[in-house]
């Protein structure tokens, strides 16, 4: 029995030795792995490269699996041990299933019982082409063309060696790409580190002081906030300057703006103001420069009331009184010669520089005409010199009269009892006869007149008087000039210190053409 038992294992061993299957693939040329059309099929370069890097088959052959496992040295040993284990495991399965049939048949369940060592999960492509490795560089590599070198023959390099070389090149390309990406990111990280170090150094600078950091930060915040508020205030003042430019300098009186006029060549209009005190006829005109600054203030008339006091602002009233005192001091020399005669009448010698003032049109009770805009320049310059008249006065104010006298005479200059000096002449548009300008020769008398002949009637002489005389009619020099009666209240006498003449003199409004 012992011999039989010894023979049976020997027979079993012999039978297993005969029926053991051999997993070996038929010899396959090396070039067939790059294309699936057979040996006679010659694909293009792109097809060759695509077949090299990807394989559509889900289950690889043993040679391809072994070649993929060779990419890592550790997997090679595991793959070798797995092949031996598969060979021993496959023998009883085939003998039981086939009853000791031919060893060429392999159980179809072989792929299901494949050891885990050979179950290599791979992406759709066998290799991932790195950014640094292109198909052109792969084709130009000497190792790729060495596969088909005539010196080595068709099988100069094995399948495993070729795949190992391509894998090494791919890994090297991946390493180069990773190094480049790290170098490109390195400067940004260093800059961030430098900024963090600078911030840390700035926060650590005040550590030597005795004050805590919270106080230092609070002081820094207050300083920055103060600078910001200062810049905002400067911007606000810069923006609000054009808005406040419409308000002239405060002279102590209350004014109400009643009109303005656009000046040619300037963005800022000419403003007209009137004193807000009841029954006060004082008005003023404010001229501005191109940048909005007040360049000239022209006053007309005198205040018949005292300087008003500011409500709840003592400083403002003091400033107003100081300004009024300055006006009085600067014009004290002009007031000395007039104070003796102001008890009976008060005259004003202020003249407007242009005739477009709207305040003169509204004074119908004392003015029957309009100011000529075409007066000569000497008169205008003299008028501007007289701008600074005293504004702080409690006397009664009398506005300037403007009277037009039209007579028929062969002589242009009529004898009205006063002495005149001619200071200019001008040709009026639409009138062939010139206009002559005269000024009273009495000192400190600002009365003027201009004489012209009517364009429609050459014998009609039009004489326009401006202002009132602040003196009596001077005595006649010779008897030849006694053309006027001695009675000053005669209706033929034009005397502006008393009642206005109403006899032969016809008053009319002057029409400027």
UniProtKB/Swiss-Prot annotation:
Induction: By salicylic acid and during leaf senescence. PANTHER family: WRKY TRANSCRIPTION FACTOR 3-RELATED, WRKY TRANSCRIPTION FACTOR PROTEIN 1-RELATED. Transcription factor. Interacts specifically with the W box (5'-(T)TGAC[CT]-3'), a frequently occurring elicitor-responsive cis-acting element. GO terms for cellular component: nucleus. The keyword DNA-binding applies. In young, mature and senescent leaves. Its main location: nucleus. Residues 179-201 have a biased composition (Low complexity). Residues 1-11, 229-240, 368-387 have a biased composition (Basic and acidic residues). Keywords: DNA-binding, Nucleus, Repeat, Transcription, Transcription regulation. PROSITE patterns: WRKY. It holds the Pfam family WRKY. The lineage of its organism: Eukaryota, Viridiplantae, Streptophyta, Embryophyta, Tracheophyta. It is found in: Nucleus. Residues 1-26, 175-281, 297-394 are annotated as: Disordered. This is Probable WRKY transcription factor 3. InterPro entries: WRKY_dom, WRKY_dom_sf, WRKY_plant. Residues 244-308, 409-474 bind DNA. One of its GO terms (molecular function) is transcription cis-regulatory region binding. Residues 202-228, 311-335, 343-355 have a biased composition (Polar residues).
